[in-house]
């Protein structure tokens, strides 16, 4: 990473799918400048595991897990009785998930450009449902959430799955979906039409502030998953 120094200012959007060594200081400053100037950001799946000691990054991603995080990473953030809960400072891990399984996602804001026209509830293909996430960021819009069922070793809470983050004038879309396995056959979550469509819509919104993509006919329903095995 020591020689990696992309020119972020050349882009409208940065998609974060990285969970490794800390970036060089120059690169971190360049990224923060991009964000503060209004560049769009997508936080994808395990990117919220990265950089536990980078305070500004953790505000940008909203919440995070794993990577050595614990109580100092901030309170647990989840839904309770239909509202965001920010004040759960109880002890425990930061980041977990039960068995990979299918689960229903519920829309938290049907008028947001990313979710407008999508079903109020839809069944996602087998994936990790992140739970027990902690953070210091400001969650703006909960786009989709899912119940982390204890029968699949979940938290028993309504967990945020897709949301936006309030951070200056940038637009940030965070999705915890999309676990990638070691082979095409082990990438069921990424084959889900719901995952693909919401990622593309979230990326367009983060880059431009609007969504022009129509909802495809093969979007999942509340009871039926929909796979695009060729990723198209």
Which role fits each region the language model picked out?
Residues 21-113:
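A glycine-rich, often tryptophan-bearing local segment used as a flexible ligand/cofactor-contacting loop or short
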Residues 1-5, 29, 156-162:
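Alpha-helical scaffolding within the catalytic cores
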Residues 79-171:
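Catalytic beta-strand/loop cores that center a nucleophilic Ser/Cys/Thr
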Residues 7-14:
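Short acidic/histidine-rich motifs immediately flanking catalytic phosphotransfer sites
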Residues 58-60, 107, 120-126, 130-138, ...:
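Oxidoreductase and adenylate-handling cofactor-binding alpha/beta cores
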Residues 150-232:
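Extracellular ligand-binding/catalytic regions of CAZymes and related secreted enzymes
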Residues 1-2, 19-23, 41, 47-51, ...:
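Solvent-exposed loop/turn segments at secondary-structure junctions
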